[in-house]
Each structure stands twice: as structure tokens, then as C-alpha cells.
């Protein structure tokens, strides 16, 4: 029997990488004539433009007690899913997937979990990791971003899983910037420990005296905003550092910058790096597990890879990218992967795996 309705469950739709993937998949599924509903655990504002047929149902906070709140939220998730009567459920990121599998036990609804990070590190709560071991075998399918991430799991789970690239809508990715680039170094992502923005600030503090006309601009929100602001002040670079928050026009604002830097300690397949390269930006990234940046960047060919946490290596990479000739070569080579990364076949692969049928031509 054909699958006609999908429910996607996530934390929120406020602007992170997983949510961007959900927005693009939902719009594609809707264009294929499928019914699509997104359930969010939080009741934050929806950051992405969705097809009018895609509904978003927030759960929201249920209690001031952290444990009770989690239990009540997932009880509500179960109730909402049963009301929607979907043919399948897709959940992401991994922590959400663990608890969705638990909440939907006994419903006989097929649940797919999309791993979005480094499984050696995330989930970062011991109880959730234990539950992952127990619950993942009950999933209908698992979606991994890299072969390295897939290799973490036992053979039995690898057999029911698949590695799928992040879908990218070419219509929302600006083309390569033509003209003299701004003397701005851009970072973007959640202001959390995973992204290691302090590394970026410290490397920039070494770079700035040689390049006083450069600025560092970090887009995103998170719990470390005040800490980063204070660090910039203590490094005497506060007047060259900007933290503008989230932006609905992030890619357009990034595109003319001199370089993009991803300083993370670990990632899955980082959307923002992928999109920066699709725009033909000079890009620097840590060679972080679970291997996403390494699949995108060929060091010294279409960008620069540096060891995780290496401040000196990042500073040296910034100095290399400050050379317009070298940066231009890296940018042009990066731009050549746009066609591969924006291929409609990526959307088709997700559709085939989840719905078990061929999509219609759009």
C-alpha cells in the first residue's frame, strides 16, 4: 500500500542545520503530493518558508520539572502522532529519535531516525546513549550522513541503514560572488561548545594585528553568547568582532565575505559549510569527526582542513586565505561541487528510501 502521509518530529524550526533539511524535505514531499506534518517539541517561531500544505504542530513546555516535562512532552507527541495517523514517522536529530521510538512503542507506525552528528559523542547524556542501544533496533530505518557515522553502529543496524547526503535546494543558494570580497571572516552556527567558537576568536586575535581592516562576524544564537562577547573583549578584538544573531538571509550576507570558517570539534555533515562551498566561498574547516568536512574539502585543492582544536593551524590557514589569489583558486574549485551537492537525485534518494516508490518529475 502506498505511503501518503509523513510526520516529521524535531526540536524546533528556528534555524539550525537539521531543521533546514526538514524544511527542504517537507517542501519536496508536498510537491510530490504527500501529506506532511511537522511536530516540534518546542513552540518557537518557524524560521523557514514552508509549503502552505505543510502543517507545524508545536508541543511546548509542559512542566518546570525537567524530567516531568520530557515525559509529558513525549506523551503528547504520541497522542499527536496517533491523531495524525501517518504512514511513517521521520525523527531528527538523534536524541529526538531515541525518545520518539520509545514514545511510539506499540503503535506499529514505522519510525525512521536521521543521525545528524558524531555518534561517538552525541547524544551526550548517558541515559540517552543507553536508550539508543535499546531503541535503535526497533526503528524501521536509520539515515546516516557519513560512512564514518554509520560504521559506529553494529552490523545489524548498518544493514537497515543508509547514507544519504543532505538535500540542498539550488534555488535558495546564491551563485558565486563576483567582485572584490569584503575583508570579513564569517562563522555561523549554534553558539555552543560543539562549535568551538572560542577557537575562532583566539585564532582571529592572532590574525587581526596583521590585518587591522578585517572583521570577524559570527552568525547564530546559543548559550555561549555572553562568554564569547567577554572573550572577544579580553582578547582586545571586541571592536572587530560582530555577533549579529540569526538571519533569514544568512547565505546572502555570507556570500561576499573573504572566507568562511567552521571551527567545530565534531559534526555530522555541516550544512553551513556545504552551502558556503556551493556559493564558491573560500572555506576553512576543522577535520572533525564524523568525517563530514573531509568529504567536502580536499585540503589545498578546494579549501583548507586543519586539525581539531589547533589554534595555530587555524591562524596559518587564515593567513593563507587572506591572499586573494590563493583564496580565489580555492573558491573557484569549491564552486565546482555545486552541481553535485544540489543534485535533485539527493531528494529522490530520500524519497525512495522513505516512501518506497519513485517520485514524479517536477
Where are these regions (language model features)?
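A conserved mid-protein helix/loop that constitutes part of the nucleotide-sugar donor-binding site
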Residues: 16-24, 183, 190-209, 218, ...
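N-terminal strand-loop element at the rim of the active site
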Residues: 3, 8-69, 154
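Short His-centered aromatic/hydrophobic patch
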Residues: 43, 91-97, 115
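Donor nucleotide-sugar binding/catalytic pocket of nucleotide-sugar-dependent glycosyltransferases
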Residues: 137-173
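Short hydrophobic beta-strand element within catalytic cores of glycosyltransferases
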Residues: 282-287
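Conserved acidic donor-binding segment of nucleotide-sugar-dependent glycosyltransferases
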Residues: 296-300, 304-311, 318-325
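A charged, aromatic-enriched C-terminal amphipathic alpha-helix characteristic of glycosyltransferases
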Residues: 325-355
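Aromatic "clamp/platform" in nucleotide-sugar-dependent glycosyltransferases that forms part
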Residues: 246, 265
Amino acid at each position: 500500500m502506498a505511503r501518503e502521509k509523513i510526520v516529521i518530529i524535531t526540536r524546533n524550526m528556528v534555524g539550525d542545520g537539521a531543521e533546514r533539511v526538514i524544511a527542504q524535505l517537507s517542501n519536496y514531499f508536498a510537491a510530490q503530493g504527500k501529506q506532511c506534518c511537522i511536530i516540534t517539541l518546542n513552540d518557537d517561531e518557524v524560521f523557514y518558508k514552508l509549503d502552505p500544505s505543510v502543517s507545524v504542530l508545536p508541543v511546548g513546555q509542559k512542566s518546570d520539572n525537567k524530567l516531568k516535562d520530557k515525559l509529558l512532552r513525549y506523551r503528547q507527541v504520541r497522542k499527536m502522532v496517533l491523531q495524525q495517523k501517518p504512514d511513517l514517522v521521520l525523527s531528527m536529530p538523534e536524541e529526538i529519535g531515541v525518545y520518539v521510538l520509545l514514545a511510539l512503542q506499540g503503535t506499529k507506525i514505522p519510525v525512521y531516525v536521521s543521525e545528524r552528528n558524531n555518534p561517538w559523542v552525541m547524544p551526550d547524556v548517558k541515559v540517552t546513549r543507553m536508550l539508543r542501544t535499546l531503541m535503535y533496533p526497533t526503528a524501521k530505518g536509520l539515515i546516516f550522513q557519513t560512512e564514518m557515522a554509520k560504521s559506529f553502529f553494529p552490523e545489524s543496524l548498518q544493514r537497515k541503514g543508509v547514507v544519504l547526503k543532505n538535500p540542498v535546494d539550488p534555488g535558495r543558494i546564491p551563485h558565486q560572488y563576483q567582485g572584490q570580497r569584503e575583508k570579513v571572516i564569517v562563522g555561523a552556527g549554534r553558539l555552543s561548545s560543539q562549535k568551538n567558537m572560542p577557537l575562532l576568536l583566539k585564532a582571529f586575535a592572532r590574525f587581526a594585528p596583521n590585518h587591522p581592516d578585517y572583521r570577524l562576524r559570527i552568525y547564530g544564537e546559543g548559550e555561549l553568547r555572553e562568554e564569547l562577547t567577554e572573550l572577544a573583549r579580553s582578547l582586545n578584538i571586541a571592536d572587530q568582532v560582530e555577533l549579529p544573531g540569526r538571519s533569514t538571509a544568512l547565505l546572502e550576507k555570507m556570500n561576499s565575505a573573504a572566507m568562511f570558517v567552521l571551527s567545530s570539534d565534531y559534526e555530522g555533515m555541516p550544512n553551513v559549510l556545504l552551502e558556503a562551498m556551493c556559493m564558491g566561498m573560500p572555506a576553512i574547516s576543522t577535520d572533525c569527526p564524523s568525517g563530514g568536512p573531509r568529504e567536502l574539502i580536499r585540503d589545498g585543492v578546494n579549501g583548507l582542513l586543519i586539525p581539531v582544536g589547533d589554534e595555530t593551524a587555524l591562524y596559518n590557514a587564515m593567513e593563507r586565505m587572506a591572499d586573494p589569489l590563493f583564496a580565489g583558486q580555492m573558491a573557484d574549485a569549491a564552486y565546482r561541487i555545486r552541481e553535485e551537492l544540489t543534485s535533485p537525485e539527493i531528494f529522490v534518494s530520500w524519497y525512495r528510501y522513505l516512501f518506497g516508490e519513485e517520485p514524479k518529475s517536477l
